[in-house]
Amino acid sequence: AQYRMKYEELFFLELHILKNIKGLTKKLPGHVFSRVGEYFNTFYSHHLQFPLTGAQKRVIREIRADMGSGRQMNRLLQGDVGSGKTIVAFFTALIALDNGYQACIMAPTEILATQHFEAISEMAQKIGVKVGLLTGSTRKRQREEIHAGLLDGSLQLLIGTHALLEDTVQYKQLGLAIIDEQHRFGVAQRARLWRKNTT
């Protein structure tokens, strides 16, 4: 009886959370990413060096549907280390770029942010996408260049740590924020990142 009460309490708590999330996604309008364009198609057709798994293709299709809905997307992507979450994140960012928006990826540690930057930069340079790295140890001159590139739109994809939350970090047209290990960030921090857009 005690186990059943605990189970029911947890079940109804989860149901309440799900209801709130559904309500928020209906209330909060998002950008409409109506097309998959040159960046996505060029990388997929000419530069992808391994076949995507069925699960990766399915998730990318689901994300594309969410991004085209006009509602704010709040999606959790789970997988083991090395399961291909980074390539899914990269394709998702390319959809944002193909629709004229910028994207950012926030990681909880400088080591993880640097790993993402190195992996994604290698892929991005093949299709002419400009990627930046912003962490707590980024030098002042580099920060200024990053800030200028974000505001004029020449820096299309920014990867970093909590440094992305600084007030000085503003975008010309931020359309997508990807948060790695989102459980390591507070709700207020995630919301602050979502609000970063000068338009």
Q: Regions from the language model: what does each represent?
A:
Residues 84:
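Conserved glycine(s) of the Walker
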Residues 1-47:
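Upstream accessory/linker segments immediately N-terminal to the RecA-like ATPase cores of bacterial MutS
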Residues 100-104, 130, 153-157, 173-176, ...:
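Loop/turn-to-beta-strand initiation segments
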Residues 28-78:
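Conserved pre-motif I regulatory segment
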Residues 137-158, 165-174:
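Conserved motor-coupling elements within RecA-like helicase/translocase cores
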Residues 74, 88-117, 125-130:
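Conserved SF1/SF2 helicase motif Ia
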Residues 112-151:
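Conserved helix-turn-beta segment of the N-terminal RecA-like "Helicase ATP-binding" lobe
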Residues 149, 163-199:
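SF2 helicase catalytic motif II
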